[in-house]
């Protein structure tokens, strides 16, 4: 090969490898022979100018011949001369003064256009010269022939246009633009097949280098740096681009080789590393030509990023998934050496037999129930292995590839932690659980060839709460991760291409990324189901106790996670409401000075904790809507109200009704008395202060009666819910050991004995009390015969209602206290009933129905009765457990009497129940109910000692008739309850709780028939009396 007659030069990596890592210079004959072979036909070559040429140096030549004469169309003189062999000589140079001349004003970025192939096959982007005096078809024909595309089967589109271009247009007009190539309708298959056939004929064999290492990666850095400098150095000088790219006026360029008409961005031969290296060098070479157009440069960079991403992903498919980037392996000193060992250890540790029968000898002799138990245990193990492998797919495929792409400058805008949360931490968690808990169970079975014991899992599942704490964060961020992923798939083309490639990987098993991100939540909720399946098929008591303990631990943690998620959602909803409230304009100042001091306090923080409740509880928005409000005698105004758990906000819309401002002070729910009005759809709210005095009255008008009913009911529910939250906080402060959620560390202490673990699941949360619709007004309380389900407090034997005192309820006015007994349970035994007056214990409707309402009774209904102040309970008393709230119906069957009572009169019944037939004078046939109550409880005036012996009972001062003697004075009543501390506590709570929200006291009845006789309730007496009256009436009618 004679370099003196060289006419072509090739800078391709393969050609440089043949020429000692330097450009390959060839004559025309050698070039045609060499580059027509299969492996080298796609190389880009450039023409070498002959000696003494007036042309500028070629972009890829290492030297330039000396100038023979000054050229007028060039901008600057050359700085040296070369000999015929291309060697530079720097001796004897003269520095001549440059002659001023007109600068070149052509835009280099307009002399090429980018050709993008919008086909279903991967074809590299081409940069094609926009030649003058040549049509678009003539310029594109060599490119399409090399790609195997028929020019007549495709359409060319300009940028984002949908109108095909004519191939007769002049190519020069499209310089600096972006052209898209799409197959014509009906010819897609033929075009794709032609491209594939062309690729199969021109694809070279991969070099047998170690592990597919690219050719250029083995070149020493110094040589690569010199080669890149050789390419870039000529490009820094301005040249006549039209002559350089092949204008017809240039001699020797009339019949250029077809491959010299286009400049491919990347080579299609060689390995992926060689392709990427050539692509980067080509992009660097042409960056100087297109730098003057910012928009074109940005678009070119976007296209280049997509090509880089496709090249990277293709390399991952060919040579395997990459490792985690080094900067993230801060926990290892020599991560490169340890990673392979760690991966092999994980693979060996996850080894599992095909069936549990391979572990056990003599499985044919097992009973059917034992086989079912082993299958349930095996399902727990097998699903754990499958889940760990799913997590590894997320970390090794999705996350690791994303981080490596970001190391290469791709997808840097994607936040990996926001997309995957703490999934790597979950993967480490489950690998630890598998190796420390489940592998020992398998190894024991493999060693002993015995059955898999479910109790062996207790060590790990007893610590479930502390071990699985990372799940709290993931479950709370899962929804955000899903939303972030959907937004990226919608807006980011590079991310969409990356996810599509990853989802098609064989490790994904046709699962989507969204399905993979939902696996942790699904696995957490599946543990109780798997353990319960094992429990149902286990007969050994000790094993069942251990499994119940594990189920309890898992369910407590899941309940805790649900609570955290619910509170987070409530906080987000509350933040949305706060953003809609614009200002707090409740008080107006009289002058500027007052406004200055007032401004500091004109704010309302709805995100602050609710007073009197646990800080963990979040204020909830229960109801919102538009109402018409009237305050005093003012005219009605349109308002927008927000009802929260503890307060009611009255606001008014501003401007476009998108935001509101607070116009009235917040109304505390526990200081509100609600009453419905006669006007349909209207209700009244009376705001009380700390002294239980009215400070404001607001009338609200809803658009319909149903909406008014909804506001009233929701307000009652808010009051009940708030009171319950405060009761829970006070009970938690006095009895912290009885809370539903105790500290996970205390419950899951490794040193605690298995026998001390509770075998039951966590108690369900108490039902929220709801005020009955029949108790909206104190004058219209529910009768004893109501069959609706009511919430009540059940007190175990020996327990008392010693929970902290409640504040006086919003509905507890003096008129409401008179009807307090009507809301108590009708099945409460007499010995534990709260103290009520005779009028309170009487049904007005019942007395009037049978004509037994005496004038004295009417006076009793109208006259208020003094309330006996209870004696404070001594502080030395031991704290009592908090009551449990249950739902029970207020209907109970009557206790069986020892002897059948047939046609007994009311007087005989009273004598039988009291047991004093001789000491009491025969009563009148139509005795009032209050007298019946007193005769049943005591035949005469009760002394202090009798009250102490009888324990807590009914206290009926002022209701005795003339024949029973004078009523007990207040001084006589007080000593009688000194020993009855629990009863006093219950009475105090009854008076302090609002009407309709008082829990029902339901102690366990004492055994024995005599106890049943002594503890007949007043409601039972009502029913007995009613039955006897009906029997007597029917008997009289028959006679």
Swiss-Prot record:
Polar residues composition bias: residue spans: 758-776, 811-831
Which GO terms are recorded in the biological process aspect for this UniProt protein?
A: endothelial cell chemotaxis; endothelial cell migration; regulation protein catabolic process at presynapse; Rho protein signal transduction
Where, per the database record, does this protein carry Phosphothreonine? 760, 876
Q: What GO terms are given for molecular function?
A: guanyl-nucleotide exchange factor activity
- Where the record annotates domain DH, the positions are 372-564
Localization per record: Cytoplasm; Cytoplasm, Perinuclear region; Cell membrane; Cell junction
Residue numbers of Phosphoserine PTMs: 765, 878, 903, 908
Which region ranges are annotated with the description Disordered? Answer: 58-105, 185-277, 739-785, 800-836, 967-989
Q: List UniProt keywords, sorted A-Z.
A: Cell junction, Cell membrane, Cell projection, Cytoplasm, Membrane, Phosphoprotein
What is the annotated tissue distribution of the protein whose record heads this document?
A: Selectively expressed in cortical and hippocampal neurons with prominent expression in the cell bodies and dendrites. Weakly expressed in rat fad pad ECs (RFPECs).
PROSITE patterns with a match to the protein in the record: DH_2, PH_DOMAIN
Q: What does this protein do?
A: Functions as a guanine exchange factor (GEF) for RAB26 and thus regulates autophagy of synaptic vesicles in axon terminal of motoneurons. Involved in the control of neuronal cell differentiation. Plays a role in angiogenesis through regulation of endothelial cells chemotaxis. Also affects the migration, adhesion, and matrix/bone degradation in macrophages and osteoclasts.
PANTHER family in the cross-refs: PLECKSTRIN HOMOLOGY DOMAIN-CONTAINING FAMILY G MEMBER 5 (PTHR13217:SF11), PLECKSTRIN HOMOLOGY DOMAIN-CONTAINING FAMILY G MEMBER 7 (PTHR13217)
Name of the protein in question: Pleckstrin homology domain-containing family G member 5
Can you name the source organism? Rattus norvegicus (Rat)
